[in-house]
């Protein structure tokens, strides 16, 4: 798995591969690793699929409950979502295997949090996780810069995740890109044949 998130000048960009593995076997080629919590908050997940999907599902239901209970039109903050996940992981770290990136746009503007397995939620301008992230650390250090537009960030993230899928056997498949702005959010799937590094070995 390779997941990535960054704050842009006009929103938040999230990206992830779509390969799920069982040991060394590819179990799913097109798994969705970016879950919509609200129209303006999304969560990237890496780790045990059952744990991460259960966490994302619980968070979405909890946020829906808060929205109904508060009976207001105010946006749930990205920070609240990150703190909910942090608390669950902290209290259940012996049973859950998950690392998550929470990103979105709320009343405070673009926000991004890395939620660690230990139950720590850290605000970030850029975050990457999963087994594939270790292969692209230097690439991201060199080419990521703060203040990129969402389109520039999309190009950067697409290349970075593509690099990870080539080197990491546990990452691969279509690359899932989610662009989040104050007004809207947009999801795009980039198939292997359309990815920047057109190597035949990763096109299957």
Segments (PLM) and residue ranges:
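Long, low-complexity N-terminal extensions
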Residues: 1-204
């Amino acid at each position: 798995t390779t997941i990535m998130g960054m704050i842009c000048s006009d929103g938040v960009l999230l990206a992830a591969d779509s390969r799920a593995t069982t040991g060394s076997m590819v179990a799913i080629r097109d798994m969705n690793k970016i879950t919509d919590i609200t129209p303006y908050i999304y969560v990237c997940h890496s780790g045990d699929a059952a744990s991460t999907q259960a966490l994302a599902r619980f968070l979405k239901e909890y946020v829906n409950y808060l929205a109904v209970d508060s009976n207001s039109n105010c946006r749930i903050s990205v920070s609240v979502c990150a703190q909910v996940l942090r608390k669950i992981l902290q209290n259940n770290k012996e049973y859950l295997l998950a690392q998550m990136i929470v990103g979105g746009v709320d009343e405070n503007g673009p926000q991004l949090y890395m939620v660690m397995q230990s139950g720590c939620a850290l605000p970030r301008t850029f975050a990457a996780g999963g087994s594939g992230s270790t292969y692209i650390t230097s690439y991201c250090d060199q080419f990521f810069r703060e203040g990129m537009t969402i389109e520039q960030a999309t190009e950067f993230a697409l290349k970075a995740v593509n690099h990870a899928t080539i080197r990491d056997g546990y990452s691969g498949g279509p690359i899932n890109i989610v662009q989040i702005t104050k007004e809207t959010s947009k999801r795009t799937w980039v198939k292997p044949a359309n990815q920047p590094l057109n190597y035949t070995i990763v096109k299957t």
